[in-house]
A protein has these predicted regions:
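Intrinsically disordered, low-complexity, charge-dense segments enriched in Lys/Arg
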Residues: 98-146
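Short, basic amphipathic alpha-helical segments that act as recognition/interaction helices
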Residues: 59-84, 141
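Glycine-rich, aromatic-bearing surface loops/beta-hairpins
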Residues: 149-161
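Short, positively charged interaction helices/loops
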Residues: 74-116
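Surface-exposed, Lys/Arg-rich phosphate-binding patches that contact polyanionic backbones
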Residues: 35, 42-63, 67, 91-92, ...
Length: 161
């Protein structure tokens, strides 16, 4: 799972057809509009993130959520369309979730949805975002090899062997 290579490939493959974009500025604003304003997690996801916070010493929900989201995007399978009950008190805006990377994460989500054959409407993007986020949290929390922050980093770096 080479996240950096994945993002480089993603950015290299995104192209916009000139005939579809008349007013580039308004098109860019529309393209970069987040699919969801407020991100709320399930209680199960909160509990899993609490475990990850303890293990990694990363104390901010949004940073762990970014790791989880990217972990799920790196998985080649489509997340199962399970209902997600957002019953925890963990909530953040899209901008808090993404920070300086919010536009890149949005592009990654859109490219993944396109690759998976999903439409790029706001509702589909929001659903796929929630599914990827929660799946990624589950993957990270369920990984017995993650016992400290270095283990989390090792997942993202290519093997040196």
């Amino acid at each position: 799972m080479e996240y950096l290579k994945w993002f480089e490939l993603l950015l290299a493959t995104i192209s916009f057809s000139q005939d579809k974009i008349c007013d580039r500025k308004s098109a860019l604003v529309e393209i970069m509009e987040p699919p969801i304003d407020r991100i709320k997690l399930s209680q199960s996801a909160k509990d899993q993130l609490t475990k990850l916070k303890r293990l990694t010493k990363i104390d901010q929900w949004n940073i762990l959520c970014r790791w989880a989201f990217c972990r799920s995007l790196a998985e080649p399978t489509i997340p199962s369309p399970v209902p997600i009950i957002t019953d925890s008190n963990v909530e953040m805006s899209w901008r808090v979730f993404g920070g300086d990377m919010s536009d890149i994460l949005l592009i990654a989500l859109k490219q993944r949805c396109h690759n998976d054959g999903f439409p790029l409407d706001k509702e589909t993007l929001a659903t796929q975002f929630r599914l990827h986020l929660h799946r990624g949290i589950g993957y990270l929390a369920g990984d017995p090899n993650i016992k400290k922050i270095e283990d989390l980093i090792a997942i993202a770096l290519p093997s040196q062997s």
